UniProtKB/Swiss-Prot annotation:
It catalyses: IMP + NAD(+) + H2O = XMP + NADH + H(+). This is Inosine-5'-monophosphate dehydrogenase. IMP binds at residues 313, 348-350, 371-372, 395-399, 425. Keywords: CBS domain, GMP biosynthesis, Metal-binding, NAD, Oxidoreductase, Potassium, Purine biosynthesis, Repeat. Mycophenolic acid (MPA) is a non-competitive inhibitor that prevents formation of the closed enzyme conformation by binding to the same site as the amobile flap. In contrast, mizoribine monophosphate (MZP) is a competitive inhibitor that induces the closed conformation. MPA is a potent inhibitor of mammalian IMPDHs but a poor inhibitor of the bacterial enzymes. MZP is a more potent inhibitor of bacterial IMPDH. Its EC number is 1.1.1.205. The active site is at residues 315, 411. GO terms for biological process: GMP biosynthetic process; GTP biosynthetic process. The lineage of its organism: Archaea, Methanobacteriati, Methanobacteriota, Stenosarchaea group, Halobacteria. GO terms for molecular function: IMP dehydrogenase activity; metal ion binding; nucleotide binding.
Amino acid sequence: MANDSSTDGRFSEKLRVPEALTFDDVLLRPAESRVEPDDADVATRVSTNVELEVPVLSAAMDTVTESRLAIAMAREGGLGVLHQNMDTDRVVAEVERVKRADELVIDRENVVTAAPEQTVEAVDEMMDRSDVSGAPVVDDDDTVRGIISATDIRPYLEVGESDAVREAMTDEVITAPEDITARDALELMYEHKIERVPIVNDEQHLVGLVTMQGILERREHGSAARDQNGRLRVGVAVGPFDTERATAVDEAGADVLFIDCAHAHNLNVIDSAREIKASVDADVVVGNVGTREAAEAVVDFADGIKVGIGPGSICTTRVVTGSGMPQITAVSQVADVAAPAGVPVIADGGIRYSGDAAKAIAAGADAVMLGSYFAGTDEAPGRVITMNGKKYKQYRGMGSVGAMQSGGSDRYLKDDDEDEEYVPEGVEAATPYKGSLASELHQLVGGIQSGMGYVGAESIPAFKADAEFVRVSAAGQTEGHPHDVMITDEAPNYSPQGE
Protein backbone atom coordinates (compact mmCIF):
# COMPACT_ATOMS: atom_id res chain seq x y z
CA MET A 1 0.00 0.00 0.00
CA ALA A 2 1.39 3.38 -0.99
CA ASN A 3 2.42 5.68 1.80
CA ASP A 4 -0.28 8.39 2.21
CA SER A 5 1.63 11.60 2.90
CA SER A 6 -1.57 13.60 3.30
CA THR A 7 -2.51 12.09 6.65
CA ASP A 8 -1.13 15.11 8.48
CA GLY A 9 -4.27 17.01 7.47
CA ARG A 10 -2.46 20.00 6.05
CA PHE A 11 -4.93 20.32 3.18
CA SER A 12 -8.14 19.38 4.91
CA GLU A 13 -7.30 21.90 7.62
CA LYS A 14 -7.67 24.62 4.96
CA LEU A 15 -11.37 23.86 4.93
CA ARG A 16 -11.79 24.84 8.55
CA VAL A 17 -12.60 28.30 7.31
CA PRO A 18 -13.74 31.48 9.07
CA GLU A 19 -17.09 32.98 8.22
CA ALA A 20 -17.18 36.09 6.02
CA LEU A 21 -20.25 38.29 5.62
CA THR A 22 -21.63 40.83 3.21
CA PHE A 23 -24.42 43.40 3.27
CA ASP A 24 -27.43 41.08 3.00
CA ASP A 25 -26.12 38.91 5.84
CA VAL A 26 -26.55 41.58 8.51
CA LEU A 27 -28.81 44.38 9.72
CA LEU A 28 -28.19 47.29 12.05
CA ARG A 29 -29.73 46.71 15.46
CA PRO A 30 -32.14 49.57 16.30
CA ALA A 31 -31.32 51.39 19.53
CA GLU A 32 -32.66 54.15 21.76
CA SER A 33 -32.29 57.47 19.97
CA ARG A 34 -32.89 61.19 20.21
CA VAL A 35 -31.34 61.79 16.79
CA GLU A 36 -33.63 62.96 14.00
CA PRO A 37 -32.33 61.84 10.59
CA ASP A 38 -32.09 65.40 9.24
CA ASP A 39 -29.90 66.32 12.22
CA ALA A 40 -27.41 63.50 11.67
CA ASP A 41 -24.03 64.94 10.65
CA VAL A 42 -22.52 62.92 7.80
CA ALA A 43 -19.31 64.95 7.45
CA THR A 44 -16.28 62.69 7.26
CA ARG A 45 -12.63 62.39 6.29
CA VAL A 46 -11.60 60.37 3.23
CA SER A 47 -7.86 60.94 3.52
CA THR A 48 -5.39 62.61 5.83
CA ASN A 49 -6.12 66.15 4.66
CA VAL A 50 -9.44 65.92 2.82
CA GLU A 51 -12.78 66.26 4.57
CA LEU A 52 -16.19 65.96 2.91
CA GLU A 53 -19.66 67.07 3.92
CA VAL A 54 -21.09 63.76 2.65
CA PRO A 55 -19.33 60.38 2.90
CA VAL A 56 -19.67 59.46 -0.76
CA LEU A 57 -17.24 59.09 -3.68
CA SER A 58 -17.94 58.20 -7.30
CA ALA A 59 -15.94 55.32 -8.72
CA ALA A 60 -12.94 55.77 -11.00
CA MET A 61 -14.62 54.07 -13.96
CA ASP A 62 -14.75 55.23 -17.57
CA THR A 63 -18.55 55.05 -17.66
CA VAL A 64 -18.93 56.82 -14.31
CA THR A 65 -16.52 59.65 -13.51
CA GLU A 66 -15.13 62.30 -15.78
CA SER A 67 -15.00 66.03 -15.09
CA ARG A 68 -18.74 66.67 -15.49
CA LEU A 69 -19.70 64.15 -12.82
CA ALA A 70 -16.72 65.08 -10.63
CA ILE A 71 -17.90 68.71 -10.64
CA ALA A 72 -21.42 67.64 -9.69
CA MET A 73 -20.12 65.39 -6.90
CA ALA A 74 -17.94 68.12 -5.39
CA ARG A 75 -20.75 70.67 -5.55
CA GLU A 76 -22.94 68.30 -3.52
CA GLY A 77 -20.21 67.75 -0.92
CA GLY A 78 -18.79 64.44 -2.18
CA LEU A 79 -15.73 63.55 -4.24
CA GLY A 80 -15.46 62.38 -7.83
CA VAL A 81 -12.48 60.22 -8.77
CA LEU A 82 -11.43 60.55 -12.42
CA HIS A 83 -10.74 57.21 -14.13
CA GLN A 84 -7.37 56.23 -15.56
CA ASN A 85 -8.46 55.29 -19.09
CA MET A 86 -7.29 58.71 -20.32
CA ASP A 87 -3.86 59.79 -21.46
CA THR A 88 -1.96 62.12 -19.17
CA ASP A 89 -2.70 65.30 -21.13
CA ARG A 90 -6.42 64.61 -21.10
CA VAL A 91 -6.65 63.77 -17.41
CA VAL A 92 -4.67 66.92 -16.56
CA ALA A 93 -7.20 68.91 -18.61
CA GLU A 94 -10.03 67.15 -16.74
CA VAL A 95 -8.49 68.06 -13.37
CA GLU A 96 -8.11 71.67 -14.48
CA ARG A 97 -11.73 71.75 -15.68
CA VAL A 98 -12.95 70.67 -12.23
CA LYS A 99 -10.68 73.15 -10.47
CA ARG A 100 -11.82 75.98 -12.70
CA ALA A 101 -15.54 75.21 -12.37
CA ASP A 102 -16.46 77.22 -9.27
CA GLU A 103 -13.48 79.48 -8.67
CA LEU A 104 -14.37 82.96 -7.42
CA VAL A 105 -11.27 84.41 -9.05
CA ILE A 106 -9.86 82.20 -11.76
CA ASP A 107 -6.06 82.52 -11.55
CA ARG A 108 -4.30 84.03 -14.55
CA GLU A 109 -2.68 80.74 -15.56
CA ASN A 110 -6.12 79.15 -15.81
CA VAL A 111 -7.82 82.00 -17.68
CA VAL A 112 -8.47 81.28 -21.35
CA THR A 113 -7.43 84.39 -23.29
CA ALA A 114 -7.45 85.57 -26.90
CA ALA A 115 -5.05 87.81 -28.81
CA PRO A 116 -6.29 90.74 -30.95
CA GLU A 117 -4.73 89.32 -34.12
CA GLN A 118 -6.19 85.81 -33.78
CA THR A 119 -9.01 84.85 -36.12
CA VAL A 120 -12.56 84.58 -34.87
CA GLU A 121 -12.64 80.96 -36.04
CA ALA A 122 -9.52 80.04 -34.04
CA VAL A 123 -10.86 81.62 -30.86
CA ASP A 124 -14.23 79.90 -31.29
CA GLU A 125 -12.47 76.53 -31.51
CA MET A 126 -10.29 77.39 -28.51
CA MET A 127 -13.27 78.35 -26.35
CA ASP A 128 -15.10 75.18 -27.39
CA ARG A 129 -12.11 73.02 -26.40
CA SER A 130 -11.78 74.80 -23.07
CA ASP A 131 -15.53 74.73 -22.37
CA VAL A 132 -15.79 78.50 -21.81
CA SER A 133 -18.19 81.01 -23.34
CA GLY A 134 -15.95 84.08 -23.31
CA ALA A 135 -12.35 85.26 -22.99
CA PRO A 136 -10.41 88.45 -22.21
CA VAL A 137 -8.40 89.79 -25.13
CA VAL A 138 -4.82 90.64 -24.12
CA ASP A 139 -1.60 91.94 -25.68
CA ASP A 140 1.73 90.15 -25.37
CA ASP A 141 2.35 91.86 -22.02
CA ASP A 142 -1.09 90.79 -20.68
CA THR A 143 -2.61 94.26 -20.93
CA VAL A 144 -6.37 93.85 -21.27
CA ARG A 145 -7.57 95.26 -24.62
CA GLY A 146 -11.07 93.84 -24.80
CA ILE A 147 -13.30 90.88 -24.15
CA ILE A 148 -14.93 88.48 -26.59
CA SER A 149 -17.86 86.14 -26.04
CA ALA A 150 -19.67 83.46 -27.99
CA THR A 151 -22.38 86.05 -28.67
CA ASP A 152 -19.80 88.38 -30.25
CA ILE A 153 -18.41 85.56 -32.37
CA ARG A 154 -21.65 84.05 -33.66
CA PRO A 155 -22.36 86.55 -36.49
CA TYR A 156 -18.79 86.27 -37.78
CA LEU A 157 -18.91 82.48 -38.12
CA GLU A 158 -21.28 82.87 -41.05
CA VAL A 159 -19.60 85.65 -43.02
CA GLY A 160 -16.28 86.61 -41.46
CA GLU A 161 -14.70 83.74 -39.57
CA SER A 162 -11.25 84.76 -40.79
CA ASP A 163 -11.67 88.27 -39.38
CA ALA A 164 -9.41 89.28 -36.52
CA VAL A 165 -10.64 89.19 -32.94
CA ARG A 166 -10.14 92.97 -32.65
CA GLU A 167 -13.00 93.39 -35.13
CA ALA A 168 -15.45 91.32 -33.08
CA MET A 169 -14.44 92.02 -29.49
CA THR A 170 -15.98 94.49 -27.06
CA ASP A 171 -13.23 97.03 -26.43
CA GLU A 172 -14.89 98.97 -23.62
CA VAL A 173 -13.99 96.52 -20.87
CA ILE A 174 -15.25 96.67 -17.30
CA THR A 175 -12.43 95.49 -15.03
CA ALA A 176 -12.04 95.09 -11.27
CA PRO A 177 -9.13 95.30 -8.79
CA GLU A 178 -7.52 92.29 -7.16
CA ASP A 179 -9.23 92.82 -3.79
CA ILE A 180 -12.81 92.78 -5.10
CA THR A 181 -15.33 90.78 -3.05
CA ALA A 182 -17.93 88.38 -4.40
CA ARG A 183 -20.74 90.80 -3.52
CA ASP A 184 -19.03 93.76 -5.24
CA ALA A 185 -18.27 91.68 -8.32
CA LEU A 186 -21.89 90.54 -8.54
CA GLU A 187 -23.17 94.11 -8.22
CA LEU A 188 -20.75 95.23 -10.94
CA MET A 189 -22.02 92.54 -13.29
CA TYR A 190 -25.67 93.37 -12.63
CA GLU A 191 -25.01 97.09 -13.14
CA HIS A 192 -23.32 96.61 -16.50
CA LYS A 193 -25.29 93.52 -17.60
CA ILE A 194 -22.16 91.43 -18.12
CA GLU A 195 -21.23 87.87 -17.17
CA ARG A 196 -17.47 88.11 -16.62
CA VAL A 197 -15.08 90.70 -15.21
CA PRO A 198 -11.31 90.62 -15.79
CA ILE A 199 -9.27 91.24 -12.63
CA VAL A 200 -6.33 93.56 -13.26
CA ASN A 201 -3.41 94.98 -11.29
CA ASP A 202 -2.37 98.63 -11.15
CA GLU A 203 -0.72 98.35 -14.59
CA GLN A 204 -3.95 96.98 -16.11
CA HIS A 205 -2.32 93.59 -16.60
CA LEU A 206 -4.63 90.59 -16.34
CA VAL A 207 -4.26 88.65 -13.08
CA GLY A 208 -7.55 86.73 -13.02
CA LEU A 209 -11.20 86.53 -14.00
CA VAL A 210 -14.50 86.53 -12.10
CA THR A 211 -17.61 85.05 -13.72
CA MET A 212 -21.28 85.35 -12.88
CA GLN A 213 -21.62 81.57 -13.11
CA GLY A 214 -18.80 81.03 -10.62
CA ILE A 215 -20.32 83.37 -8.04
CA LEU A 216 -23.81 81.90 -8.35
CA GLU A 217 -22.51 78.32 -8.20
CA ARG A 218 -20.60 79.05 -5.00
CA ARG A 219 -23.68 80.66 -3.45
CA GLU A 220 -25.92 77.73 -4.42
CA HIS A 221 -23.55 75.02 -3.19
CA GLY A 222 -22.60 76.04 0.33
CA SER A 223 -21.62 72.49 1.35
CA ALA A 224 -19.40 71.85 -1.65
CA ALA A 225 -16.08 70.08 -1.23
CA ARG A 226 -13.46 72.80 -1.69
CA ASP A 227 -9.72 73.12 -1.22
CA GLN A 228 -7.99 75.88 0.74
CA ASN A 229 -8.26 78.17 -2.28
CA GLY A 230 -12.01 77.67 -2.64
CA ARG A 231 -11.75 75.41 -5.69
CA LEU A 232 -13.72 72.19 -6.03
CA ARG A 233 -11.92 69.07 -4.88
CA VAL A 234 -11.21 66.17 -7.21
CA GLY A 235 -9.58 62.75 -6.96
CA VAL A 236 -7.67 60.96 -9.70
CA ALA A 237 -6.99 57.26 -10.22
CA VAL A 238 -3.41 56.45 -11.17
CA GLY A 239 -1.85 53.14 -12.09
CA PRO A 240 0.32 51.58 -9.41
CA PHE A 241 3.49 52.11 -11.46
CA ASP A 242 2.62 55.36 -13.26
CA THR A 243 4.72 57.91 -11.38
CA GLU A 244 4.75 60.28 -14.36
CA ARG A 245 0.96 60.49 -14.41
CA ALA A 246 0.83 60.87 -10.64
CA THR A 247 3.25 63.79 -10.75
CA ALA A 248 1.38 65.48 -13.60
CA VAL A 249 -2.06 65.38 -11.96
CA ASP A 250 -0.55 66.43 -8.65
CA GLU A 251 0.92 69.52 -10.30
CA ALA A 252 -2.46 70.16 -11.96
CA GLY A 253 -4.07 70.43 -8.53
CA ALA A 254 -5.57 67.00 -7.80
CA ASP A 255 -6.44 66.71 -4.11
CA VAL A 256 -6.23 62.94 -3.72
CA LEU A 257 -4.47 60.30 -5.81
CA PHE A 258 -5.96 56.82 -5.73
CA ILE A 259 -3.52 54.00 -6.41
CA ASP A 260 -5.91 52.07 -8.64
CA CYS A 261 -5.17 48.37 -8.46
CA ALA A 262 -7.45 45.35 -8.13
CA HIS A 263 -5.02 43.70 -5.69
CA ALA A 264 -2.94 46.24 -3.79
CA HIS A 265 -1.56 43.61 -1.39
CA ASN A 266 1.17 43.03 -3.96
CA LEU A 267 4.66 43.91 -2.81
CA ASN A 268 5.59 45.54 -6.11
CA VAL A 269 2.46 47.70 -5.93
CA ILE A 270 3.19 48.66 -2.34
CA ASP A 271 6.80 49.61 -3.12
CA SER A 272 5.68 51.77 -6.04
CA ALA A 273 2.87 53.35 -4.00
CA ARG A 274 5.44 54.40 -1.39
CA GLU A 275 7.51 56.04 -4.12
CA ILE A 276 4.49 57.87 -5.51
CA LYS A 277 3.54 59.05 -2.02
CA ALA A 278 7.03 60.48 -1.55
CA SER A 279 6.94 62.31 -4.89
CA VAL A 280 3.63 64.21 -4.64
CA ASP A 281 1.97 66.78 -2.39
CA ALA A 282 -1.54 65.34 -2.78
CA ASP A 283 -2.90 62.72 -0.41
CA VAL A 284 -2.46 59.13 -1.60
CA VAL A 285 -5.15 56.49 -1.03
CA VAL A 286 -4.07 52.89 -1.60
CA GLY A 287 -6.41 50.18 -2.86
CA ASN A 288 -7.95 47.85 -3.32
CA VAL A 289 -7.44 45.53 -0.39
CA GLY A 290 -9.67 43.14 1.52
CA THR A 291 -7.82 41.76 4.53
CA ARG A 292 -6.29 42.75 7.84
CA GLU A 293 -2.83 41.77 6.60
CA ALA A 294 -3.13 44.00 3.53
CA ALA A 295 -4.08 46.96 5.70
CA GLU A 296 -1.07 46.32 7.94
CA ALA A 297 1.18 46.43 4.87
CA VAL A 298 0.12 49.96 3.83
CA VAL A 299 -1.19 51.70 6.93
CA ASP A 300 2.16 53.27 7.80
CA PHE A 301 2.25 55.47 4.68
CA ALA A 302 -1.21 55.56 3.08
CA ASP A 303 -3.45 58.60 3.58
CA GLY A 304 -6.45 56.32 3.13
CA ILE A 305 -7.23 52.69 2.34
CA LYS A 306 -9.80 51.55 -0.21
CA VAL A 307 -11.53 48.22 0.37
CA GLY A 308 -13.14 45.88 -2.13
CA ILE A 309 -12.02 42.65 -3.79
CA GLY A 310 -14.72 41.71 -6.27
CA PRO A 311 -17.98 43.05 -4.76
CA GLY A 312 -19.02 45.28 -7.67
CA SER A 313 -22.08 44.53 -9.79
CA ILE A 314 -20.00 44.34 -12.98
CA CYS A 315 -16.99 42.62 -11.40
CA THR A 316 -16.25 38.94 -12.08
CA THR A 317 -13.01 38.72 -10.11
CA ARG A 318 -14.41 36.25 -7.59
CA VAL A 319 -15.74 33.78 -10.16
CA VAL A 320 -12.84 34.15 -12.61
CA THR A 321 -10.04 33.94 -10.04
CA GLY A 322 -11.75 32.21 -7.12
CA SER A 323 -10.44 34.99 -4.89
CA GLY A 324 -12.13 37.71 -2.90
CA MET A 325 -13.60 38.74 0.42
CA PRO A 326 -17.26 39.50 1.24
CA GLN A 327 -17.44 43.23 1.73
CA ILE A 328 -18.70 43.70 5.29
CA THR A 329 -16.01 41.40 6.65
CA ALA A 330 -13.37 43.03 4.45
CA VAL A 331 -14.29 46.52 5.65
CA SER A 332 -14.29 45.51 9.31
CA GLN A 333 -10.91 43.78 9.09
CA VAL A 334 -9.26 46.74 7.38
CA ALA A 335 -10.89 49.19 9.80
CA ASP A 336 -9.51 47.21 12.76
CA VAL A 337 -6.04 48.19 11.54
CA ALA A 338 -6.70 51.61 10.01
CA ALA A 339 -8.87 53.21 12.69
CA PRO A 340 -6.28 53.09 15.52
CA ALA A 341 -3.76 54.66 13.12
CA GLY A 342 -6.18 57.44 12.14
CA VAL A 343 -6.26 56.34 8.50
CA PRO A 344 -9.66 56.65 6.77
CA VAL A 345 -11.27 53.62 5.14
CA ILE A 346 -13.31 53.74 1.93
CA ALA A 347 -15.70 50.88 1.12
CA ASP A 348 -15.63 50.42 -2.65
CA GLY A 349 -18.29 48.30 -4.34
CA GLY A 350 -21.28 46.08 -3.70
CA ILE A 351 -23.59 48.86 -2.49
CA ARG A 352 -27.04 48.50 -4.06
CA TYR A 353 -29.17 50.38 -1.55
CA SER A 354 -28.59 53.28 0.83
CA GLY A 355 -28.89 50.77 3.68
CA ASP A 356 -25.81 48.98 2.35
CA ALA A 357 -23.88 52.24 2.58
CA ALA A 358 -25.04 52.68 6.17
CA LYS A 359 -23.93 49.14 7.00
CA ALA A 360 -20.51 49.73 5.42
CA ILE A 361 -19.95 52.82 7.57
CA ALA A 362 -21.19 51.05 10.70
CA ALA A 363 -18.70 48.26 9.94
CA GLY A 364 -15.82 50.74 10.03
CA ALA A 365 -15.74 52.65 6.74
CA ASP A 366 -15.41 56.43 6.78
CA ALA A 367 -16.94 56.76 3.32
CA VAL A 368 -18.35 54.68 0.48
CA MET A 369 -17.52 54.59 -3.22
CA LEU A 370 -20.17 53.71 -5.79
CA GLY A 371 -20.16 53.00 -9.51
CA SER A 372 -23.44 51.59 -10.82
CA TYR A 373 -25.39 53.86 -8.46
CA PHE A 374 -24.16 56.91 -10.41
CA ALA A 375 -23.56 55.38 -13.86
CA GLY A 376 -27.18 55.99 -14.84
CA THR A 377 -27.14 59.72 -14.07
CA ASP A 378 -27.11 62.56 -16.58
CA GLU A 379 -23.58 63.56 -15.58
CA ALA A 380 -22.01 60.12 -16.17
CA PRO A 381 -20.17 59.77 -19.52
CA GLY A 382 -21.74 56.46 -20.59
CA ARG A 383 -23.90 56.59 -23.72
CA VAL A 384 -27.68 56.31 -23.48
CA ILE A 385 -29.22 53.05 -24.74
CA THR A 386 -32.93 52.36 -25.35
CA MET A 387 -34.10 48.79 -24.84
CA ASN A 388 -37.75 47.70 -24.90
CA GLY A 389 -38.81 51.32 -24.68
CA LYS A 390 -36.80 52.00 -21.52
CA LYS A 391 -33.68 54.17 -21.27
CA TYR A 392 -30.41 52.80 -19.93
CA LYS A 393 -26.83 54.05 -19.81
CA GLN A 394 -23.73 52.11 -20.69
CA TYR A 395 -21.88 50.73 -17.67
CA ARG A 396 -18.82 48.51 -17.70
CA GLY A 397 -16.29 47.17 -15.28
CA MET A 398 -12.73 48.40 -15.53
CA GLY A 399 -11.79 44.73 -15.81
CA SER A 400 -14.02 44.21 -18.85
CA VAL A 401 -12.49 43.59 -22.26
CA GLY A 402 -13.61 46.99 -23.56
CA ALA A 403 -12.16 48.89 -20.61
CA MET A 404 -8.90 46.94 -20.77
CA GLN A 405 -8.56 47.71 -24.47
CA SER A 406 -9.01 51.38 -23.59
CA GLY A 407 -6.06 51.25 -21.21
CA GLY A 408 -7.36 49.71 -17.98
CA SER A 409 -5.25 46.54 -17.95
CA ASP A 410 -2.71 48.21 -15.65
CA ARG A 411 -5.27 48.09 -12.85
CA TYR A 412 -5.21 44.29 -13.02
CA LEU A 413 -1.40 44.08 -13.19
CA LYS A 414 -1.47 42.89 -16.79
CA ASP A 415 0.67 44.04 -19.71
CA ASP A 416 -1.05 46.13 -22.37
CA ASP A 417 -0.22 43.73 -25.22
CA GLU A 418 -2.52 44.02 -28.23
CA ASP A 419 -1.45 40.58 -29.47
CA GLU A 420 -2.43 38.85 -26.24
CA GLU A 421 -6.01 37.89 -25.51
CA TYR A 422 -7.29 39.51 -22.32
CA VAL A 423 -8.49 37.53 -19.32
CA PRO A 424 -11.23 39.91 -18.15
CA GLU A 425 -12.43 40.32 -14.58
CA GLY A 426 -15.52 42.35 -15.43
CA VAL A 427 -18.42 42.66 -17.84
CA GLU A 428 -19.99 45.31 -20.04
CA ALA A 429 -23.60 46.07 -19.17
CA ALA A 430 -26.30 48.73 -18.92
CA THR A 431 -27.90 50.38 -15.91
CA PRO A 432 -31.28 52.16 -15.83
CA TYR A 433 -31.22 55.86 -16.64
CA LYS A 434 -31.84 57.78 -13.41
CA GLY A 435 -31.73 61.53 -14.06
CA SER A 436 -29.62 63.98 -12.09
CA LEU A 437 -26.81 63.02 -9.76
CA ALA A 438 -28.08 65.46 -7.12
CA SER A 439 -31.33 63.51 -6.82
CA GLU A 440 -29.58 60.14 -6.50
CA LEU A 441 -27.13 61.50 -3.95
CA HIS A 442 -29.98 63.00 -1.94
CA GLN A 443 -31.64 59.59 -1.64
CA LEU A 444 -28.36 57.88 -0.74
CA VAL A 445 -27.33 60.36 1.94
CA GLY A 446 -30.86 60.51 3.30
CA GLY A 447 -30.84 56.75 3.75
CA ILE A 448 -27.53 56.89 5.62
CA GLN A 449 -28.89 59.61 7.90
CA SER A 450 -32.01 57.54 8.60
CA GLY A 451 -29.80 54.59 9.51
CA MET A 452 -27.90 56.81 11.93
CA GLY A 453 -31.22 57.89 13.43
CA TYR A 454 -32.25 54.28 14.07
CA VAL A 455 -28.97 53.65 15.89
CA GLY A 456 -28.98 56.96 17.78
CA ALA A 457 -25.73 58.25 16.27
CA GLU A 458 -25.41 61.97 15.59
CA SER A 459 -22.13 61.76 13.64
CA ILE A 460 -20.13 59.33 11.52
CA PRO A 461 -17.61 58.63 14.33
CA ALA A 462 -20.48 57.93 16.74
CA PHE A 463 -22.16 55.71 14.16
CA LYS A 464 -19.00 53.65 13.74
CA ALA A 465 -18.53 53.38 17.50
CA ASP A 466 -22.10 52.65 18.61
CA ALA A 467 -23.73 50.63 15.83
CA GLU A 468 -24.35 46.92 16.43
CA PHE A 469 -25.23 44.21 13.92
CA VAL A 470 -27.55 41.20 13.92
CA ARG A 471 -27.29 38.21 11.58
CA VAL A 472 -30.10 37.74 9.08
CA SER A 473 -31.40 34.42 7.76
CA ALA A 474 -32.57 33.85 4.20
CA ALA A 475 -36.13 34.21 5.47
CA GLY A 476 -35.17 37.45 7.18
CA GLN A 477 -33.73 38.80 3.92
CA THR A 478 -37.00 38.02 2.13
CA GLU A 479 -38.96 39.65 4.94
CA GLY A 480 -36.90 42.82 4.62
CA HIS A 481 -38.00 43.48 1.04
CA PRO A 482 -41.54 44.27 -0.11
CA HIS A 483 -43.32 40.91 -0.31
CA ASP A 484 -46.70 39.39 -1.11
CA VAL A 485 -47.66 42.48 -3.12
CA MET A 486 -47.28 43.85 -6.63
CA ILE A 487 -45.48 47.21 -6.62
CA THR A 488 -47.55 49.71 -8.59
CA ASP A 489 -45.58 52.91 -7.99
CA GLU A 490 -41.80 52.56 -7.79
CA ALA A 491 -39.96 54.37 -5.02
CA PRO A 492 -36.98 56.54 -6.02
CA ASN A 493 -34.65 54.63 -3.68
CA TYR A 494 -35.73 51.02 -4.19
CA SER A 495 -35.97 48.42 -6.91
CA PRO A 496 -36.26 44.64 -6.43
CA GLN A 497 -32.95 44.11 -8.25
CA GLY A 498 -31.16 46.92 -6.42
CA GLU A 499 -30.77 48.87 -9.66
